Amino acid sequence: MQMKKISCASLSPDDMLSLLEITRSYCGTADSWQTLRPLLERKEVWGFYKGTSLVGYALFTPSDRQLGGSVTLTCFRYRWEYNDETSLLQMMELIPTSFAARFHCLLMDVSRTHELNLDFYHRIGFCESILPSPKGRGNVVLLADLKSFPVMKKEKR
């Protein structure tokens, strides 16, 4: 698996269709490319490829000055056939190798109710801080030092 920075202008028709299909599998609101394109253009978009096929994507936003040196993973979506721990680990391990030169910290906002996701993220190096949400339930902000991700430790050896 590999991770490549992508832009709306450089996408092939097959990749556009894949992005739309992946997005539709999570939420029905992206009913057309015209609906999805503005969202993608506001973020830094990276695609996860298995061979030449786009199997997932992630949207990132560099954080403001208060959290300088960090990047926020705002959206992480993939084809359902890649919803297994091995595939998810492969995708997540590609992030620090792509961002560690520019950022030191990766942030993610995850709902407290997603216990399996939280357990997975903890095992790959994230720590957490609970923040109250507007509805009072509280979300978990996950933080990870990009240089201490397990994959980065392997590369240092």
Predicted regions located by residue number:
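Active-site rim helix/loop that mediates acceptor-substrate recognition in acyltransferases
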Residues: S25-G51
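Conserved acetyl-CoA-binding loop-helix of GNAT-fold acetyltransferases
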Residues: N83-T97, R123
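Conserved beta-strand-loop-alpha-helix junction that forms the acyl-donor binding cleft
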Residues: L107-L118, P134-R137
